[in-house]
């Protein structure tokens, strides 16, 4: 009996030791995994990579994580999405992509952190990689010809950005190597709800890296001069403060110049009527193709890439498979479709035979709008696809008002005394522009209609 108890006791000791060894092994493995992630998060390339850039001269990449993200298929897809959509039909140089812009935003944030914020007690440099990743990936979910596409198919590029960050993607795999919660943290920064508002402000505010890059980049590629401002000065006077990024008061005039540049770019480039006309034609192409599909029309060139969007059941992989090159290929084939509306609209878009426009708000002048509809019908065209009301508006600067949440965080100045003041309180120029929303109403119609508008 004593012998059996001894054997039983020895067996228990063995099992306990085995269990402890297993737990210890798992703990060591987990610790090693954490070390590997820490090593990856701080890993530097053996040799710095640089991208030659017409706006910033060079884009510098030293972090392994950033380099790995750039090489993912989801980020490379941005090469095939134009930054300015249909604007290339007006300004022939505007062929730059969201890939270009995303690298530019990353470079501005890198410079702010490494050259200005680093070493300052108000800045937590452990947030550096997070800010760089959010800057690089902020436009990841944009689709082809974003705005027209979203209007017809009710997609949301912000939702797709989040889906790419958190889904079964190459980007997610890279981010997870930094930490299990790292993809979610990047998504929170881009969604503007991350706890550290300093990081959010770098990516999304009224003077963020996104705006500073696209204003200069779009001005460069369109060939205009009014999108330029003194970014070097602005970066030098940016300072991290509690829950915000502020501008030293000595840099106020550079900020005024930046806001004026943005105002002019919206009026002259982003709201250009010919670009909006092209977007109207594009909108009607997609709307007509969707309608034909719903009616069971047999396409000569079957729109397999569009089918999920027609039904509203789009998988992430299907969304990522559609880019502007593919869309243009469909439009070229559809020029020979049997449906005369679809073929004509595609011909107009491909050959830049766009709609004319008149200044008209249909709600204020319903009789004039009804008359235009009748003119379109009189030449044998369907107003549903050949008339497009459109309105554009922009707020140059959204200042702070008690009880009102601004669309973007206001710009704050740090006075020599250390006091923080909102920009519109100090700048007469910005105060005059603030909350001044200009809305421009137009209606687009075929060139075949001749009359004085």
What residues fall within each predicted segment?
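Elongated alpha-helical scaffolds
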Residues: 130, 135-136
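Short active-site segment of divalent metal-dependent hydrolases/proteases
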Residues: 137, 141-142
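Short polybasic linear motifs
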Residues: 1-2
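Histidine-centered, transition-metal-coordinating active-site segments
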Residues: 11-130, 144-148, 154-453
């Amino acid at each position: 009996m004593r012998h059996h108890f001894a054997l039983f006791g020895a067996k228990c000791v063995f099992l306990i030791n085995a269990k402890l060894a297993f737990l210890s092994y798992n703990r060591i493995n987990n610790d090693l995994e954490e070390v590997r992630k820490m090593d990856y998060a701080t890993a530097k390339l053996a040799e710095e990579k640089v991208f030659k850039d017409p706006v910033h001269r060079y884009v510098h990449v030293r972090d392994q994580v950033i380099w790995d993200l750039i090489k993912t298929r989801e980020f490379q897809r941005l090469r095939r999405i134009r930054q300015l959509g249909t604007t290339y039909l007006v300004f022939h140089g505007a062929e730059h992509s969201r890939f270009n812009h995303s690298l530019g935003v990353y470079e501005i944030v890198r410079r702010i952190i490494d050259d200005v914020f680093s070493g300052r007690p108000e800045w937590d440099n452990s947030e550096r990689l997070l800010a760089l990743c959010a800057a690089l990936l902020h436009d990841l979910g944009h689709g082809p010809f974003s705005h027209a596409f979203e209007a017809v198919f009710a997609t949301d590029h912000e939702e797709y950005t989040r889906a790419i960050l958190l889904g079964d993607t190459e980007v997610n795999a890279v981010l997870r190597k930094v930490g299990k919660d790292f993809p979610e943290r990047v998504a929170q920064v881009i969604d503007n709800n991350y706890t550290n508002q300093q990081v959010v402000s770098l990516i999304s505010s009224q003077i963020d890296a996104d705006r500073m890059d696209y204003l200069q980049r779009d001005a460069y590629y369109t060939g205009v001069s009014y999108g330029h401002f003194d970014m070097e000065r602005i970066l030098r006077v940016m300072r991290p403060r509690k829950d915000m990024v502020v501008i030293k008061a000595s840099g106020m005039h550079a900020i005024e110049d930046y806001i004026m540049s943005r105002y002019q770019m919206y009026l002259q480039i982003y709201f250009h009527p010919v670009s909006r006309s092209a977007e109207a034609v594009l909108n009607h192409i997609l709307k007509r193709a969707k309608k034909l599909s719903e009616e069971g029309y047999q396409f000569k060139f079957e729109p397999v890439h569009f089918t999920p969007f027609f039904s509203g059941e789009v998988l992430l992989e299907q969304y990522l498979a559609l880019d502007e090159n593919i869309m243009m290929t469909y439009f070229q084939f559809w020029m020979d479709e049997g449906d005369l509306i679809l073929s004509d609209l595609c011909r107009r878009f491909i050959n830049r035979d766009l709609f004319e426009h008149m200044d008209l708000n249909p709600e204020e002048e319903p009789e004039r709008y009804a008359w235009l509809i009748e003119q379109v019908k009189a030449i044998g065209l369907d107003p549903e696809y050949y008339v497009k009301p459109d309105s554009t508006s922009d707020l140059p600067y959204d200042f702070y008002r008690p009880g009102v949440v601004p669309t973007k965080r206001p710009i704050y100045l740090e006075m020599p005394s250390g006091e923080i003041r909102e920009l519109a309180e100090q700048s007469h120029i910005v105060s005059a522009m603030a909350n001044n929303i200009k809305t421009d109403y137009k209606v687009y119609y075929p060139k075949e209609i001749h009359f004085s508008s």
